Structure formats: structure tokens, C-alpha cells
Swiss-Prot record:
Signal peptide: none annotated. This is Tetraacyldisaccharide 4'-kinase. Transfers the gamma-phosphate of ATP to the 4'-position of a tetraacyldisaccharide 1-phosphate intermediate (termed DS-1-P) to form tetraacyldisaccharide 1,4'-bis-phosphate (lipid IVA). GO terms for biological process: lipid A biosynthetic process; lipopolysaccharide core region biosynthetic process. Residues 343-366 are annotated as: Disordered. It comes from Cupriavidus pinatubonensis (strain JMP 134 / LMG 1197). It comes from the Bacteria.
Length: 366
């Protein structure tokens, strides 16, 4: 993304956090977008449009807002939890930023430029089958041919992909929540905050679940030991970089979340926010004064899969461990285990209509 486009994106993102002149100027278009979103969901729910039912439970992790909220680490954590429960999960994702002519399996040795950065990170971290293709229903069916043992599907960032029916929907937010609460383009919402869902997951270390909102859960990302990009066997605690001249760079949906976690570990980094899914085709550190002056450059795991060609011993990767409220993990396990026996005996079917079921009333994330 060029600098002017990046600046425009930053401007719009900032406007989405308030109800200023920009929001009111865009409001007529926002009302139209909201109407289209509601009609589209209603159409799939009531069988106006064709959708596909898979012979297994489908769990969707997505968001009603534009931008990253931590879906990838959530999918990794859920895949690991389902595996520990004795299930055999598979993951289907779009493959953002890559051109695909047919469904493609993501292997730990794949290139991010071929399959996308987030699917590659999931494949490496979760050790489960991961496939990518914009048509998630076709992608899932293709995956089942190659991996017939898969008995539960995780759909990464597929909340609005209604062509694939689902059994359990998780709507994610981060500390920005729903912004100004308005639909695109006046605000960040793809769908209303009141949209029904089975659970709300908030990626914010300061969030605490309460009995008053029983289906709203929290997630935090704990920093692990950093490892050197050129030599992953070299590892040290992030706190070991305190007192050093540090540049932190992040090409994720909310770079400030990464920077804040480093400050919480005792670092005082210079920061380099990059566009989400930045491809690193151009070296952002070359000629950057803060990078030239830095003793250490810290990047995210998501960015690391695109930086493997860089030969710079100053670059260290900061992995995170997602920690999700146990209540949500237990709820998903129960829901999936209750459906797996039926799923095993049910033949695959394409072309069914309607969503699998009505979800319970959603919790407004405000």
C-alpha cells in the first residue's frame, strides 16, 4: 500500500471512532448499506439464496467490523482446544491478498505469497489441515476429499459468507469495539451490532466477563519468548530488550495492540505501523531513520512469514499465546460433541438452502 493510501486509511479509521462530520456526510450511504446487509442475511436465512450444508459442525469466527480483531489467534486456540477434546478440526480461509484458481492446501512450508499470511500462520501453529479459496463451501468440500477424517470445521473470517451454513457463530471485537456504531461507510460496521450470534469474544486484556452478559467472553494475547528471524533457535524474553533502542513494526489490523503489549513488557519502542497484510515486497526498514538507529527490530508472527528472506540479525519475532475464557471453550466443546455423531452419519449435501439454525439473540457490543 502506498503512503497516500495508507494515510487515507488512517484518516477513515480515525473517523469511524467518532460521530463527526465524516459520519454524518456518509450516513445516507450507511443506511443503504445496512438495508442491503439485512436483506442479504434474511435471504440466506429463509432460503432465497442457495447455500451448502456440510456433514459436520461448522464454527465461524468473524467480526461485524472492518479490520483485524484477533481472529487468527482465536482460530489457532480453538483448533488446539478441539484437538485436545479428541476431535479432528480443519480450517478454511479465504486466502486474503492472493489469487487462487482452485482450493489450495496450506502446508507449513508454503509461501505466504501463495496462500496468505494468516492461513500460513494457522497451519504452522495449529497442526491441522488448512485450505484456502474465496468460495469457502467448495474449499471445505475439497478439503474433505483429501482429509476425510476431519469432523469439525473452523471457518476463519467467514461471518458474512452465508453460502456456507454454520452451527456456531463467534463475533469478535477488540478494544475499539464497534467504533461509532454506524454501518459502512459512515462507520466500521459490516452488520449491525445487534446481529444474532452464539457468542461474543472480545480481544482485550482489560475485559472481564460478567454474569450479566453470559455469552460475552474475553481473550488476551500473552507474549512468549522472542526468537531471532535468521536463527529461530535463539530465543530470549521480550523484557530482555528493555533499555535497548527498539523499533516495533506491525502489519496487522490493529498495530497499536502489539505496541501496547511491548510497552507492558517494559519496552519503550519507536513504532512503525504498517497496513494490514503488508506484503514486505519493499523493505520498510531500508532507509527508515528509526530502523537505522535501532539495536533491535521486533515484528509479529504474522509478519514474520513474509520476512524470511530478510538477512538482518536485529529482527526478532514476538509470538503470542491466545488465552480464551474457559467458558467459551467449554460451550463450543459441548455444542460440537453433541453434533459430531450425527455429522459422521450424515452424507455430504450441496445446494441446501437456508442457514442451519436461528442463533440466539446477539449481545450489542457496546
Amino acid at each position: 500500500m502506498s503512503a497516500p493510501r495508507h494515510d487515507l486509511a488512517d484518516f477513515v479509521t480515525a473517523q469511524w471512532q467518532r460521530r463527526g462530520w465524516f459520519a454524518w456526510l456518509m450516513l445516507p450511504f450507511s443506511l443503504l448499506f445496512g438495508l442491503i446487509a439485512r436483506v442479504r442475511r434474511y435471504g440466506y436465512l429463509h432460503g432465497w439464496f442457495k447455500s451448502t450444508r456440510l456433514p459436520m459442525p461448522v464454527i465461524v469466527v468473524g467480526n461485524v467490523t472492518v479490520g483485524g480483531t484477533g481472529k487468527t489467534p482465536a482460530v489457532i486456540a480453538l483448533a488446539q482446544a478441539l484437538t485436545e477434546a479428541g476431535l479432528r478440526p480443519g480450517v478454511v480461509s479465504r486466502g486474503y491478498g492472493v489469487t487462487l484458481k482452485h482450493p489450495r492446501r496450506v502446508k507449513p512450508t508454503s509461501k505466504a505469497s501463495d496462500v496468505g499470511d494468516e492461513p500460513l500462520l494457522i497451519a504452522r501453529a495449529a497442526d491441522v489441515p488448512v485450505w484456502v479459496f474465496p468460495d469457502r463451501a467448495l474449499c471445505a468440500q475439497t478439503m474433505l476429499v483429501s482429509h476425510p477424517g476431519v469432523n469439525v470445521l473452523l471457518l476463519d473470517d467467514g461471518l458474512q459468507h452465508y453460502r456456507l451454513q454454520r452451527d456456531f457463530e463467534i463475533v469478535m471485537f477488540d478494544s475499539r469495539m464497534g467504533g461509532n456504531g454506524l454501518m459502512l461507510p459512515a462507520g466500521p460496521l459490516r452488520e449491525p451490532l445487534s446481529r444474532p450470534r452464539d457468542a461474543t469474544l472480545i480481544n482485550d486484556p482489560n475485559f472481564r466477563a460478567t454474569p450479566e452478559r453470559p455469552d460475552v467472553y474475553g481473550m488476551r494475547l500473552d507474549l512468549d519468548e522472542a526468537w531471532q528471524l535468521n536463527d529461530p533457535t535463539m530465543a530470549r524474553p521480550v523484557s530482555a530488550f528493555a533499555g535497548r533502542r527498539v523499533l516495533a513494526a506491525a502489519g496487522i489490523g490493529n498495530p497499536e495492540r502489539f505496541f501496547a503489549s511491548l510497552r507492558g513488557a517494559g519496552l519503550s519502542p519507536k513504532t512503525l505501523p504498517l497496513p494490514d497484510h503488508y506484503d514486505f515486497a519493499e523493505d520498510p526498514f531500508a532507509g527508515n531513520p528509526d530502523a537505522l538507529d535501532a539495536d533491535v527490530i521486533l515484528i509479529t508472527e504474522k509478519d514474520a512469514v513474509k520476512c524470511e528472506r530478510f538477512d538482518d540479525p536485529r529482527i526478532w519475532v514476538v509470538p503470542t499465546t491466545p488465552v480464551i475464557d474457559a467458558g467459551l471453550i467449554d460451550k463450543i466443546r459441548r455444542a460440537v460433541l453433541a453434533r459430531v455423531p450425527a455429522a459422521k452419519s450424515t452424507p455430504a449435501s450441496g445446494g441446501a438452502t437456508g442457514l442451519n439454525k436461528e442463533h440466539q439473540d446477539g449481545q450489542p457490543a457496546a
